[in-house]
């Protein structure tokens, strides 16, 4: 066992050029852990609070010097001397120190940076890779990538309403081949778009961001790219969508697809998703309805919950209270896991545990504003989640996670598992 002797935070930049928090934790053994905190664009109203300075003369108000100061002046003195391996006690101490339900006093970005850096330092102290420190001897499942290759909504400056169009290589024998398949489709998609005279600039998460005639056209160009890469849609590679519907939901209680000029009621949204699922090989829809449209979610789950994966992101915000409500209402069948939505490693693990016990899947995810930190790669293997969302095979802030997963698969050798279609263990195949 080794105790914490130093905690230090600094302001660094994320992949969008905005400031974020990085924390280093040192133990008396000399072990050091470093973690950087991500930041979202389409954030749920119920997420833990990311503390920003608000000083318009610095970084347009997005500085994080307050959060950095909170780590250095408030959190560090409280935690120095604590055992690094006592993650639960450390996270609990920070939650109590903050004293608010949404971490708005110290900032979830301050607290999470410390929480993850402590775990990394403790893993180094134990001589274990982070995934094994988190998950123990049974951490062996490599995730199916849910790879975002075409961007719209808040992740791109185009007329496509649906935020993410993703591919999932369920027919791959292992993670390495899964990544290759996705990369090949990505490059073929670039050629398909180019041949149609469409833009191949990329969005925040590395996916292409062309202007298209409809959201459905996005699906069609991806299917064309899958076939051109030599794969069979629906067998080798399936599709997943993240419409980020909270962003489409307006005060009139309807969903506004401004790119297409269409307005839909919650019932019409459910009909729309059902039509797409019946027409295309879509196996997962994330945030198909808005974060507070519980009745719409209930209807969506009744109609499609046995057939496809329905992921709650803004709906659940990695929060056990929100998830518990969803489970009791029979809403959705999967939770998206974003570390910075809740703000500590312990609470993140609690949400994953609750989801699994209820028969919900868990999909570990990046944010649109990322860094070179690859913690989520270790987390997804550590908890055997089986699915990861971490963007396109482009932009180093995305690729760093995939490369870490390649290293983990290599280290696990013959014990590594890749679930493919079995990652969706709670729906009928």
Curated annotation (Swiss-Prot):
Signal peptide: none annotated. GO terms for cellular component: cell surface; extracellular region; phosphopyruvate hydratase complex. Binds a second Mg(2+) ion via substrate during catalysis. The active site is at 205 (proton donor), 338 (proton acceptor). GO terms for molecular function: magnesium ion binding; phosphopyruvate hydratase activity. Its EC number is 4.2.1.11. HAMAP family: Enolase. Belongs to the enolase family. PANTHER family: ENOLASE. This is Enolase. It comes from Thermoanaerobacter pseudethanolicus (strain ATCC 33223 / 39E) (Clostridium thermohydrosulfuricum). The gene is eno.
